[in-house]
């Protein structure tokens, strides 16, 4: 049975329940609360209060999302696009990607080794296949070219 979100307390409780599961951005939390039938003015009031109390933090959400997606093997371009679709500011996204402490070239190499067992492409067709996969994962063509030509290999 779904709770009725007709009071500020109910909206706040639902928002806190969602935040207890994982970090959320303000836009995402607003969308979820609206789907549950909460009035927009109550949503804004509840989220403003949660932000003041430090329970809702865009920077914490960005850090958590970047870390999670990077551990899943996604690159900075894909992560940037996903966060943009979630309504976050481009400048905040770029800052989070710069400050996350992830070596993207190393991350790319790990993804490539897991998928292709460290085998360099033997021909143009295989090179295109590997490049497409890595590009879809969110790595730049420059990084991919460096890796597949052997210039990105330190070990």
UniProtKB/Swiss-Prot annotation:
It comes from the Bacteria. It is found in: Cytoplasm. Signal peptide: none annotated. Keywords: Cytoplasm. It holds the Pfam family RecX_HTH2. The keyword Amino-acid biosynthesis does not apply. GO terms for cellular component: cytoplasm. One of its GO terms (biological process) is regulation of DNA repair. Belongs to the RecX family. Modulates RecA activity. This is Regulatory protein RecX. It comes from Pseudomonas fluorescens (strain ATCC BAA-477 / NRRL B-23932 / Pf-5).
